[in-house]
Amino acid sequence: MLVRQPSFSLSAHDELYDILIPKDNFLRQMKELVDFSFIEEELKDKYCLDNGRNAEPPVRMFKYLLLKQIYNLSDADLVERSRYDLSFKYFLDLAPEDSVIHSSSLTKFRKLRLQDKDLMDLLVEKTVALALEHGVLKSNTIIVDATHTTSRFQAKTAKEYVQEKSKLLRKTVYKYQASIKEKFPSKPTTGSLEDELAYTNAIIDVIEKEEQLEQLPAVKEKINMVKEIIDDIEEEANYGGDPDARKGYKSTDYSFLGYKTHIAMADERIITAAVVTSGEKSDTKYLKKLVETSEKNGMMVDTVIGDTAYSSKDNLKYMKESEKKLISRLHPIITNGKRERGKEFEFNKDANMYVCPAGHLAIKKLVKKRKDSSKNPQLKYFFDVEKCKVCPLRDGCYKEGAKTKSYSVSIKSSEHLAQEAFQETEEFKRLAKERYKIEAKNSELKHRHGYEKANSSGLFGMKIQGAATIFVTNM
């Protein structure tokens, strides 16, 4: 049953908070700045309102998740720290003497209460509203980009991942007590996941019997992290790693297995919209959603800055129709074509035809329309194939036995022509220099907030991680 969380405590020990938690403490500042009651309103349909045992207040459970994300803790370590860290208890609206939840409650909260909830939009909307209310957000410009997060398992199987974490646990233990190696069971040789899990559990049992060793913070953290991974794996039937992670590419020679977060950020470095997808999704298709979500959240957008991925024909049309400026350079293939240097066909303006590298003039031309309406039509120029057969430059140009030889050139759309002219203006060049800000934000997300790697498997878990991370980053 849903119980409303009291907004104040009647404990005789509350004055400890004023003495020990400074005014500039991050958790104190967040608690005083944000009214988290919107979480209860959003999740109340997931609770029975008048029957059953009293549930832990949803606002407090959500705050536990924020703490987990801020401090990169396992569920068990989070609960343990919440017992004695007064800044945690203050943030959670607990009295100093109050007890804390069991770590299993966090798993239930994630799976039972947060399913079917768009936590990302809810939290981003809240932080944007706060920024507007406090006069932090004043610009009408957003910068768009996508940042990648590797899967928790990357390209490893669940067995390989357990082996890796088990090895890290053993290495940590050996630093304090190398002789314990004699007490560990033999490593499994069958190659099965079940045997690897049994072996790792046996190692944990041995360590936990050594009380002085088990209580060391470095060892305890590793044990709790391995236990959480094992629990995740055992809960999944037919577990096979991360089912939603997909391969994406950062360059031709660098791929990753995981997820993408498509981000819109205001000029003041407040994230105004975000969408989490699997790793293979194209950046191009999310510009419209990022703009519309930013506006729904309270932004007045008139300029969008992005890299070449966003200058597609559809995006240019959308920006023109919505009377917004797109600061995104056209891909070089559109502006310059994609022919190799030294193999270019040159246009003869007098003959209104192309001339091949051997100096032969095209004999006719046709307009070729594309089946995909988002692609520009082409002009196809035809050459005298009899000349091609005996041409000294035919290797790599004319295919032996072909009945025709043609050269195609895409006709630039009116959108591309307008953007090509716009990107040469001083205004475009000045605004394009602001794109570095979102690269810096991506770096902050990854290196300061642990967004480089997913901390759970599945798209649902990634969305929760993304929502909590961006909420904290915006604060």
What are the functions of these language-model segments?
Residues F62-L65, S104-K108:
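Positions in alpha-helical segments
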Residues M1-V34, R394-L417:
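Charged, often Cys/His-bearing segments associated with DNA-binding zinc-finger transcription factors
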Residues L49-E56, L65-S74, L94-E97, K111-D118:
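Short coil/turn segments at secondary-structure boundaries
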Residues S87-S105:
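Short, positively charged loop/turn segments that connect secondary-structure elements
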Residues S74-D77, S82, D98-S99, T107-M475:
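Anion-binding and metal-coordination hotspots
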Residues P58-Q69, Y84-F88, T261-H262, K289-E292:
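Contiguous, well-ordered alpha-helical segments that form the cores/surfaces of helical PPI scaffolds
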Residues F26-L66, I70:
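Basic, short loop/linker segments at the boundary and entry of helix-turn-helix/winged-helix-like folds
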